[in-house]
Amino acid sequence: MEVPMPESTINEDSKIFKLPEILPIMPIFHTVAFPKMMFPMDIVGNRFIQLVDEAMAKDRLLGLVLTRKAPSAEGPLCQCEDLHRVGTCVSILKLAKQAGEKAQLVVQGLARFRIVEFLEEEPYIQARVEKIEADILIKDLEIEALMANLSTLFDRVIKLSPFLPQEFAAMAKSIQEPGDLADIIASIVNASVEDKQKILETLDIRQRLREITLIVNHQLEILELGSKIQSQVQEDIDKSQRDFYLRQQLKAIREELGESDENRVEVAEYRKKIEEKMLTEEARKEAFRELDRMSRMHPASAEYSVATTYLDWITSLPWNERTQDNQDIRQARRILDEDHYGLDKAKKRIIEYLAVRKLKPDTKGPILCFVGPPGTGKTSLAQSIARALGRKFYRISLGGVHDEAEIRGHRRTYVGALPGRIIQGIRRAESSNPVFVLDEIDKVGSDFRGDPSSALLEVLDPEQNFAFMDHYLGVAFDLSHVTFITTANILDTIPPALRDRLEVIELPGYTQDEKLRIAERYLIPRQREANGLTPEQIKFTRGAARLIISGYTREAGVRNLEREIAAVCRGVASQIAEGEISSALISARDIHRYLGPVRMISDARERISKPGIAMGLAWTPTGGDLLFVEATAMKGRKGLTLTGQLGEVMKESASAALSFIRSNAVKIGIPVDFFEETDIHIHVPAGAIPKDGPSAGVTMLAALASLLTNRTVKNDLAMTGEITLRGLVLPVGGIKEKVLAAHRAGIKTIILPKWNRKDLEEIPSKVRKEMNFVFVNDMREVLNIALSRK
């Protein structure tokens, strides 16, 4: 950095210096010249050298003026309009020419001038100028304060700046003229040329002092901030050097004592673990590569802990450690029957897998999906399967999972990265062939972080999961020996590609008799023990259990049933603890004392009391249920109103039913002109619950026919089926759940589509015997059976 050197003394003659009327103008771009200052200049180009030569031949005077654009080496030296109008006249003290059209000048500032007009532009600029005389200023307290403050600030700048010599501070304090002090400091400080030109053009000395004070103060703030940053950096460097020095000393002390280096010990331990672990070849190479990286790191570095965490995961996974499967099929069957009543289809599939495994030991594990309402034993059955197989059990819940990294893990580049939940589960199971339950697979979500269901495609595909790639591990892990069991309430929300990889086993709701046996065999003993009671202290009669099932619960599973049994057990436990009784035999008459009045009263038959009401059957994620359809007519203009939160499919079914009745009005017994001045309103009660699906078509049509023919639908009859405009009755799903719901409600007759006859095989024989099933193919058959005679 070139710093202008002020004169050691202010030449008094400069105050009476006479400025020529015409001056040669040299444009300058990177600096601003001030009076009283002496500084070197480098010039390049023949025209600049020619300008200086002519000035040297005359009076050695030049006008230095700041230009807004850099002077051109070719063409005009500068456009006149680019020049500022205030400059400094300087005297050339020394000229030293150099090779290559270069020269160096030493000049001294004499006085400010203002350009009056430009006279010539070629070969260089000449202008008529006038001298700017310095104001006569009488020092007052404000001027003295401004000068003192400026000198103090400048002194602090000198101390903080590595490029400015300390002599400048003493020189500034020796200057008595306010204008000279402002000019000299402006030429020295590291300010922009625009700011310096502003100081040059400020003729009011008081204002000039204020302006240069602001500039110096800003420069001081920058220097102080830089000094603070430098101090912090130096402290960090000193601490690092100190830590390094202490570690080296500690290392030397340990060597003198014969102790091994901690890093070497840890590396040796990991090497031993890797060699002893039965890793795959790919995993072994990756582990040794990471170990080699770790051996070159300092134990205090962040990367060192990342490497140790990775090696901990690699060496703790059960790469080839498996449990021995139970080959005794009879014992496995006994265990399954001990833990669960019914569920024959799921048990049969597990026994088949065991049989195949016994004949072909290297067979891959099945990927099952248990689908059914809540409380039907999906998760507990998976635990029972693990016990029957003699395997470890692990479960993760996928409900609400939105991040793909939950399945595949995070890449090691991220802070706090870990493997996904699949690999974490395998590690915790400590076996490469556990029974692995993915609970609530139908409730997996997706968002901007990825789609977990897509990541599960690799996990649940037997053709791919032998080389499952977790992002954190970075090596393939064999999942083909894992028995994956997924659970869901419905299949509709599972993506088709994922559903295709699952072997679906439906676990429908239980019948009343099945619930009774489950309560007697499992629920009552479990709650009795959970509440600290013995078999002698509490007993349930069969009538009491039946009343709890029918009067206090209405569900496909047995979860609420167990809660009600637990409530009775707690009530008895309270009485025994208070000394009121020593034991209790719970009969049907006693239930209301513990559970209150009966909550579930079947009013299905009473609800069908007049024309326009029909009873249908619905299937929901929680099991089957009754669905009532109500229809009414009023004067209007052939309008159809649908209420009850119906979905699009149900609305279309209602429109199809009305169109069928209108097109077959004569056959059904309805006047043809009846619809011309009539509005129809169809309502499905429980309006707060959204409803959709095609299976209510026959129920809607029956309700409309009942209304328009003024014939009631039989009150012990329910129906389900999809309809077409031609009156055909098409098959629907969920037959078992719907039939069981009707059976619980005491319905005796059910109308089913003809194509659903095959589904009766899944219904317990006791239920089939107690109910009458009518299979139809056409809506006319439905109306003949469902509508009572006039």
Curated annotation (Swiss-Prot):
Alphabetically ordered keywords of this record: ATP-binding, Cytoplasm, Hydrolase, Nucleotide-binding, Protease, Serine protease, Stress response
Catalytic activity: Hydrolysis of proteins in presence of ATP
Record's note on what induces expression: By heat shock.
GO biological process, one term: protein quality control for misfolded or incompletely synthesized proteins
GO cellular component: cytoplasm
PROSITE patterns according to UniProt: LON_N, LON_PROTEOLYTIC, LON_SER
Oligomeric form and interacting partners: Homohexamer. Organized in a ring with a central cavity.
NCBIfam families: lon
Protein name: Lon protease
